[in-house]
Regions:
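Alpha/beta catalytic barrel-like cores
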Residues: 1-136, 144-146, 196-214, 218-299
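Eukaryote-skewed repeat-based solenoidal scaffolds used as protein-protein interaction platforms
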Residues: 138-212
Length: 299
């Protein structure tokens, strides 16, 4: 796939984006969920080798390349690794899957109801390396814990400032200001977030487009103005702590929004499964998430 083919697939394709981007802090939890306890490694290198083996197993599973997975978000070390003897982004492209990379370095402590992104040292070099490896876009996450208008405005402004840097590097940013689905004022946060994003989009030059990765809104259809916006390439949903069943049910009530799930995609996979068991389990998850992304129901 060339750049224009990847753009068309992400903009119009039926399917969803797999999030395979657990980073250093969340890797032990991801491995434990996969059936590998902390005693199985003695240093970070061994830990990252284990998580790369898991991701390689996912990427090389026949069902992962069945056309239902449009793209995959990678952790930096996964991007720099190999799958089937090829750089991971190329292995994805060979399977018809568009590669993205997570670029944020974690979250600051809560302030004004939001957790901003920590500084990202060496970002220009990372973006240049990603571009050279065939990566299409980036993903960067911050979190909204309370319906604080000024906090949310600052959070979204930081996201779009970073998005401009990504666009300047020739990549497509996935802007991810996640609303905490457990917060008491989630619906109000959705409203404030929508307003702030629309204001930032209005400031963007014509011809530039971003993607948005958002929590599934408390009110179905709330983010339709973003889905329809000419400066938005695609709106994808995070699972945000929902089970796969819950996340799929909620997502199916939001036309135009597709999944970008991590835990809800991978939760039933185990290192101890045979290849046939692993492929069957992953295939079932892919089918369910694909259906919720493409076959919508009336709210």
């Amino acid at each position: 796939m060339n750049q224009s083919e990847m753009m068309a697939k992400i903009e119009r394709g039926d399917g969803f984006i797999a999030a395979l981007d657990q980073s250093g802090g969340s890797t032990p939890k991801a491995l434990k969920g996969y059936g590998i306890e902390e005693g199985a490694w003695s240093n970070d290198e061994e830990m990252f080798d284990l998580i790369h083996q898991m991701r390689s197993r996912i990427i090389t599973s026949p069902c992962f390349a069945n056309g239902k997975v449009l793209g995959a978000i990678l952790f930096e070390r996964t991007m720099d690794g190999t799958v089937d003897g090829k750089p991971t982004p190329q292995a994805l492209i060979d399977r018809g899957i568009v590669p993205f990379i997570k670029i944020d370095k974690g979250l600051e402590d809560d302030d004004n109801g939001v957790q901003l992104m920590k500084p990202i040292p060496g970002l220009d070099e990372l973006l240049e390396r990603a571009k050279s490896l065939g990566v299409f876009g980036t993903k960067e996450r911050s979190v909204i814990n309370a319906a604080n208008a000024s906090g949310i405005a600052v959070c979204v402004a930081q996201q779009f400032q970073l998005a401009r840097q990504v666009l300047a590097a020739g990549l497509v940013p996935i802007v991810e200001p996640e609303v905490n689905i457990r917060s008491a004022d989630r619906a109000e946060s959705d409203d404030l977030l929508l307003t702030s994003i629309l204001e930032e989009l209005d400031e963007m030059p014509d011809g530039q487009r971003v993607m948005l990765k958002l929590s599934i809104p408390a009110e179905p259809g709330k983010f339709q103005p973003l889905i329809d916006h000419p400066k938005v390439l695609r709106v994808v949903a995070l699972s945000g702590g929902f089970s796969r069943e819950e996340a799929c049910r909620e997502l199916a009530r939001n036309p135009g929004m597709i999944a970008s799930f991590s835990r809800a995609l991978l939760s039933d996979l185990r290192a101890q499964q045979s290849d046939s068991e692993f492929d069957s389990t992953l295939g079932q998850a892919i089918d369910e998430i694909y259906s919720a992304s493409t076959a919508k129901v009336l709210a």
